[in-house]
C-alpha cells in the first residue's frame, strides 16, 4: 500500500498559531469553523477529482465532530490554488478560522500531484503544506491523508481517516446470510471478502493490515480460523483447534496471538506462536475466560472471566502471571479492547433494570487506575451495543448497535462510531446490516 509519496510544501513562513490546540479528551467543544476551498486543476477531469477531494476532506473533518466545514455558498473570495496568499479578511468575514487551499495536476508519469496548504486566517500564517503524488485511482486515499494532516496539526493527535474497517455484513432477510466485508472507515469502497455460504464471525486485522483472520464454520464440524491475504485474495486455514469461537488478537510485534479455547467444560486463554503454531495456556481453574486483548506494548493482556460468578474484567502479564481484577461495577462485563495509546480499555457491560430488562452499554475505564479509583465511564447505551474497537489514535470507538424485531419487521444491526468523550455518535453507512467491526492501523 506504499503508493503515496509526500513532499513538504512550505510557501510562506509559519511562526505562530492563533488557534489553540483542541483537547479531544475534554467535554464537548464548539467545532472549529474551516473553509475547504475549491482545488485548482489543470484539466476538466482533474477538476472533477479536485471537487471530490474537497468533499472527502470536508466529510472527514465534519465526522470527527471537531470541525465545522463552511458551505462554499458562503465563500466571498473566488481566488483558488496555492500560488498566492489568500485574502484573509474575506475568510474571517465568514467566520472561517482555518482555510484549506489546494490543486490537482497530472504528472508525466500518469500520477496525480495533489497539493494543499492549511492557513490560519487570524494570524494569516501557513500551518502546514504538503504535496502528495498518487496513482489516479488513489485520489480518495490522498484526500483522507490531507484530512489526517489537518486533524493532527490542530488536535496534536494523529489522524485516523486513511484506515479500513473489516466487519460482518448481514442480510436483512431471514435466514440471515453473513459475509466478511471490508470498507473505508467512512463506509466507502465496500467490498465482500467471503461468499456467504458459511457462518463467519469476528474478523481481525493482522498487524500488516494486508491480511485478515476470521472464524468460519465452513465444515459444520467445528470452527476454523482462516487467514485471507487482501492483496492476492488467497486464504488458508490457520488452525483447527477444537473449541475456538472467536478469531485471535495479535501481539504488537505480530509474532503471537491470543484466543480462547473451550475444553472439558472450561474456556481458557491461550497464546499461539504464529511461527511454530505452539500453544501456551495462560489461565487456569474453572470457569469461562474469553475475549483477550493485548496492551500496546504487548506486556499485558486484558480479558473477561466469570471465575467469581459474574463476568468481570481482568489484566494479567502476557505470560499469565500477576492476575488483577479491574472492574467492580454492577452488571456483566465483556469484549474488552485495549486502546492503542494504552490509557483506556473499552468494554461492553450488561445491566438489568428492576423489571429484569437488559440494557447493553459501551464504556471505558483506565487501564491502570489508582487504588480504589472508579474510572469507569459509560459512553453509550441501547437495546444491543457491543463489540467496541478503537481508532488507531485511541480517540474514537466503533461498535455494533442493534434494534429488536417488531410486528413482522425484523431487527437490524448497524455500525456506529462515538468519541471517547461520549459525544458525536454517528452511524457508518453500510449496504446491509453490520456487526463485529475491527479498525485497521493507518495505511502506509
Swiss-Prot record:
It is found in: Periplasm. One of its GO terms (cellular component) is periplasmic space. One of its GO terms (biological process) is cell division. Its main location: periplasm. InterPro entries: 6-blade_b-propeller_TolB-like (IPR011042), PD40 (IPR011659), Tol-Pal_TolB (IPR014167), TolB_N (IPR007195). The keyword Cytoplasm does not apply. It comes from the Bacteria. Residues 1-18 form the signal peptide. Keywords: Cell cycle, Cell division, Periplasm, Signal. Belongs to the TolB family. Part of the Tol-Pal system, which plays a role in outer membrane invagination during cell division and is important for maintaining outer membrane integrity. The Tol-Pal system is composed of five core proteins: the inner membrane proteins TolA, TolQ and TolR, the periplasmic protein TolB and the outer membrane protein Pal. They form a network linking the inner and outer membranes and the peptidoglycan layer. This is Tol-Pal system protein TolB.
